[in-house]
Amino acid sequence: MVTEAFEFVAVPFNSDGWGPPDASDVSSSASPTSVAAANLLPNVPFASFSRSDKLGRVADWTRNLSNPSARPNTGSKSDPSAVFDFSAFAIDEGFGLASSGGNPDEDAAFRLVDGKPPPRPKFGPKWRFNPHHNRNQLPQRRDEEVEAKKRDAEKERARRDRLYNNNRNNIHHQRREAAAFKSSVDIQPEWNMLEQIPFSTFSKLSYTVQEPEDLLLCGGLEYYNRLFDRITPKNERRLERFKNRNFFKVTTSDDPVIRRLAKEDKATVFATDAILAALMCAPRSVYSWDIVIQRVGNKLFFDKRDGSQLDLLSVHETSQEPLPESKDDINSAHSLGVEAAYINQNFSQQVLVRDGKKETFDEANPFANEGEEIASVAYRYRRWKLDDNMHLVARCELQSVADLNNQRSFLTLNALNEFDPKYSGVDWRQKLETQRGAVLATELKNNGNKLAKWTAQALLANADMMKIGFVSRVHPRDHFNHVILSVLGYKPKDFAGQINLNTSNMWGIVKSIVDLCMKLSEGKYVLVKDPSKPQVRIYEVPPDAFENDYVEEPLPEDEQVQPTEENTEGAEASVAATKETEEKKADDAQA
């Protein structure tokens, strides 16, 4: 096998610097070094570079020249240095150097694009994204897309939160309505609906009454024990039980004093403070309630049924948190109402000075038998003038008396009860001593109707002070044992201003209902608060309705008689006429 000998060429030495010597310098020398320098490829350029530049290929031995005529004239058809020629041909798109036919003017129009990513900030959110997604896009464009996606994600998250909150509120609203959907009285098939009045009409009413006249004061009052004003959650007091004392919840028409006053023709309208307070605060109510109305001659009696909802005290009526619907649950609306009534009775007797001293009045308790132990209560029969030919007499209750500034002052005693802090969100044992305002604000939100009715009753009775106790369970699951945590006192007029209870609006509601009922014929009627809508309805019922031998057969809601448009318009027209009469009287008084 014959092989060609491999000839080693001499490596030229450059005495002037690094790298091969310039070929132009070796023209006359005949040394091997000069000969090797003369054989160097003349068209291999030198390009300066930095470490941040991308490196391309040194030579491309597989490239076919697409435009051979553009090759510079080197005097040889097959120039071995063509593969190294960077100036005449674009070797690769990755180099960033190209020539358009070797024209220097066109080459000057090209600009290198900075491919370096922008410097990352040392602080700020570290958003994660796929580095291999859209690799061909520039880094600036990629950052803009990341910001746009971030904004879209924020909008989507806000939209989901908004929908979640709306659905959550709707669920609570539906559950709240479902818990209070049952009517306080079963609507019978033979009942005839006469009027339907929305609460929005009540809010526009206003009527000013003159100072009432005291007709009679019955019963006896014990003095308030001021030591209970010093009670705090740290020195709580156990709530006692007063089983031997009798409490009376007598309706209007069964009151012997009211019967006597009606016989003496002292007034045309008769009611109790609890019934009037229910009417005055009707727009704040959520649960269903009912009032029996009897028209006898030219007189009107507002009564309550035996075992009526008015005998109980609502708990968490105006709260957004739903209560258990099961009647057997200790935290259901009915169970809490019974518990609240029991707490109020015991609280009103425990905070008294039990030394036998009692303030007596004109007559004894009209409902007590001789020798019977009765609770401390006084009944104040007062008369208001509603019109020139119309007066209203109401029986108002007071629970205690005290000497304030050497003057006799009448008090009303009521108690708020805490059953489970998780429902209200405020633990009384932790907040009562340091944040009483927050506790009271929470109670106004959850029990606004009950507090408004207590205030209305205190105003009707002309009480000098309202005492409100804060009573809590010993344990959230123990509804028999309770403790008194604190007692606060308020003036009724000042407290009415705090809870936005307008006296003129209260009497405007009563006046409109009385005017509407005085237009009815003699008979028995019932006014029912709708269980699911903010409105009241007036039904005509048989004379034997709500008697002991009267059997009630509930009628489904969809089969109940609905009011005609004429009746609805008639009720609104009556209310509007009452409002016009009030405005005319006000103008005459100013004139």
Curated annotation (Swiss-Prot):
The organism's taxonomic lineage, starting at the top: Eukaryota, Viridiplantae, Streptophyta, Embryophyta, Tracheophyta
Q: Does the keyword Transcription apply?
A: no
Write down what this protein is called: Eukaryotic translation initiation factor 3 subunit D
Query: What GO molecular function annotations does the UniProt record carry, in alphabetical order?
Result: mRNA binding; mRNA cap binding; translation initiation factor activity
Listed under GO cellular component are: cytosol; eukaryotic 43S preinitiation complex; eukaryotic 48S preinitiation complex; eukaryotic translation initiation factor 3 complex
**Keyword RNA-binding part of the UniProt annotation:** yes
Check the record and name the InterPro entries matching this protein. Answer: eIF3d (IPR007783)
Instruction: Quote the function comment for this protein.
Output: mRNA cap-binding component of the eukaryotic translation initiation factor 3 (eIF-3) complex, which is involved in protein synthesis of a specialized repertoire of mRNAs and, together with other initiation factors, stimulates binding of mRNA and methionyl-tRNAi to the 40S ribosome. The eIF-3 complex specifically targets and initiates translation of a subset of mRNAs involved in cell proliferation. In the eIF-3 complex, eif3d specifically recognizes and binds the 7-methylguanosine cap of a subset of mRNAs.
Q: Where in the cell is it found?
A: Cytoplasm
What is the species listed in this Swiss-Prot or TrEMBL entry?
Arabidopsis thaliana (Mouse-ear cress)
- The UniProt annotation puts the region (RNA gate) at 309-323
**Entry's family note:** Belongs to the eIF-3 subunit D family.
